[in-house]
Amino acid sequence: MSEIKDVIVQGLWKNNSALVQLLGMCPLLAVTSTATNALGLGLATTLVLTLTNLTISALRRWTPAEIRIPIYVMIIASVVSAVQMLINAYAFGLYQSLGIFIPLIVTNCIVVGRAEAFAAKKGPALSALDGFSIGMGATGAMFVLGSMREIIGNGTLFDGADGLLGDWAKVLRVEIFHTDSPFLLAMLPPGAFIGLGLMLAVKYLIDEKMKKRRAEAVAAELPSGETGNV
C-alpha cells in the first residue's frame, strides 16, 4: 500500500513531469492557450502513458535489452495512432485544434522516460498506475496554465468545451470579463513561459513550507536536549 501511495504522490506532485522534470515543454507551452485544449491534450497523454506502461510492462520479459528502445517507440506509436483516431472520431473540433501535437506525443520524453525508468522494471498494475499518475500530474499542470492564460487573455474559461465533451458542455463556458480584443501576451508563447515560471515559484514555496513543517514536527518530537542537532 505504501508503494502505491508513493507512486501516486510522485506522479502528481513530487516528481511532476511538467513542474519538476520539465519534460514535454513543447506541447505544454504551445497547446495551453485555453483550458479545453490543455485538458484535451493532457487526457490524451494520460491515456497513452497508461496503456504504453501497461503494455511495455506486460512484455518486459520478452523484450531484448539490445533493441528495447525501438520496441518501446513502436508500441508508443501504435497507442498514439489509436488515440488520435479516437479523438478524430469523437472530438473532431479538439482534433483540429490540437493538430500536430497529438502525433507528437510519440516523441514526448515523458512517455519514453516512464517506459524505460519504470514500466520495464515493475509489474503491469503498478506500471499502469504510474502512467496514470504521471499523466494526471501533467494534465493538472497544463490545465492550470491553460486556465490562467485563457482567463487573462480572453476573459473566458472552458471556451470550446463542446469540442471536447460534446454539445452539452457549452453550458460550461464562463465569461469572467468582456474584452473586445484578446491580451496577446497571455495567448502567445511568452505568456506561457511567464505563467509556467509563476507556477514553478508557487510549487517551490509550497514545498519549502511543507519541508519546514515536517522539520518542526520532528523537532517537537525529540527531547529538548537533542533539538539542536536537527
Swiss-Prot record:
A Pfam family it matches: Rnf-Nqr
E.C. designation(s): 7.-.-.-
Alphabetical list of InterPro entries matching this protein: NqrDE/RnfAE, RnfE
Chain's role: Part of a membrane-bound complex that couples electron transfer with translocation of ions across the membrane.
Database matches in NCBIfam families: PRK12405.1, rnfE
Family membership: Belongs to the NqrDE/RnfAE family.
Full protein name: Ion-translocating oxidoreductase complex subunit E
